[in-house]
């Protein structure tokens, strides 16, 4: 009997039907050994000896593997064709050797295949190789690095920053990206700018729009028109001028298809087009690779999904070209196949790109046989694969340059049409933060043709901060920086969310306060180890180990000597020094530019500063113990914000009533006090919440009060002198009114939930000098 060992039962089931009765295919159910989560699993002083354990969960599977291996003439290790798969095979072989006293490595045969089809499986079994110790060593080195960072840095975090959970080698760098982007957004100052649109009519009475580009031979830059007055003055002048078509430019533009999918581009495109998380994409892709029941048989529908290679096999290209010719015609088929080269930093090109194993299985032919989400992802992969071998898209571009009678003013109108749809016939790539304007046609125009100006429209704009990272754009950024590998992107994103370091809201990552604390600490005290270049450099070293160009324990020693010294150094630092640094680094985030926001909202004389307690970080008044105000900046599971110490509440959540849509409103108890919640939490989507101010007794909270709290920030009215709106809100430091972009604290003597417009204007008048100083 020949024993074949794979990772999963699904994969075993698919492969089993391709092999004869002499083979028995069983599953290891993933890794059978791992480093236990305790001190001493990696021993730097013993040349980085690694103490692996068989988990309780894996025990019964190991017993079955060992039992079957005793009866086998040979063991075929058929795990996935990457470092992780090689590592699983190595662990299986080591356990069998240990349990059965097998001495010869010839007993084990490594078989690797990129797709689970009969042809690929038979070829792999007929052409086995030995285990690649370089790949195994690279995986062991990665595992050791992650362990050494996690089990030395995390305990230090717990001591120096109570409430922080752990720090991972690669996850911490991804977290830094998210936090730094949030810093950019917080510090961003929006600037006003204007442009001028001209609604024009040609001699055939057809309308089109042009944009003003030059005034008196001066090109208009983004900030040439900076306010409404400038824009209106220019608009008035333009209305008195007549325009004509000065010059028409026509050209064609070719657009080439994107390469077939690799792991990162599949995750990005599935996020954009399908709304899938990276984790969900990989779970579905795994199933499509391992085998799906399509009625008459179970078959692997796509090639291996963890890859950074963009190549396709010659056989696959031939099949794709044949289908293009048959289904779309020869005009959609280039004269020669398209060959792609990877743009990914340090791409291994070890595997093919992700493609269907049989291109003739069209999405339509499988629609009734696949789960809805399976179908969507398969369709995406199929279309991208077909498109990558199709002809270019050809665009006709037209630029009409317009001029006033003396050429004092110049304008431009652009138009584009698709002359030949090429690969667009099948597939278009999505963009993360931009939209293309296509088929924006101009009416027929002639040079020197007089035009009528139907309208001159000034358009106000404001510069916008950089967007928060989506899953797609974060994976793209990690890939550009050379951080992580195809097998790690999904887990990086999942771990950050599981640790509550980031939240995913409206499909964008927002750092939680806990995540910002960790990032500030690591950047301040372990800067080298969260540098992007350093982390990418470690990935390069792991690649070199996999290629047999670097000894893995030498790489570990090089890392550990510096990292351990850094740990010992920070261990000696006083917590007060660390708190001082963290507060300084978070000062802008916590208080903004306004120094007055540091004043305690309770006593109005003390100053707020960062403190650390056993439950995490909080702000406290410098007048303690006379003033006991405190405000948590790291929320618990309920993620509510509240000032003051939590008051006593009944253990049960209280239903106050329902809103106008019939959604229940709860008064709930959190670790930092009571809060209002709209509806129940479903999955990871957080319902709307509002803290109950310390000035309110929770026993007096009515449905009316709860609805008011949930409605904040709320418009009070319009200031009679400026026609600017006045808003009331409740923030980190209590109630406030917002007027002309400035914030004014509402003192305790006011009932802020029922603040009148007159009282609001009175507060503004009292703070007039401060507001003018800020605006100056």
UniProtKB/Swiss-Prot annotation:
GO terms for molecular function: DNA binding; DNA topoisomerase type I (single strand cut, ATP-independent) activity; zinc ion binding. Residues 132-568 form the Topo IA-type catalytic domain. Its cofactor is Mg(2+). Mg(2+) binds at residues 7, 80. The record marks 31, 142-143, 146, 158, 306, 499 as: Interaction with DNA. Residues 166-171 are annotated as: Interaction with DNA. GO terms for biological process: DNA topological change. Residues 1-111 form the Toprim domain. The keyword Nucleotide-binding does not apply. Its EC number is 5.6.2.1. The active site is at 304 (o-(5'-phospho-dna)-tyrosine intermediate). It comes from the Bacteria. It is an enzyme of class 5 (isomerase). It catalyses: ATP-independent breakage of single-stranded DNA, followed by passage and rejoining. Monomer. This is DNA topoisomerase 1.
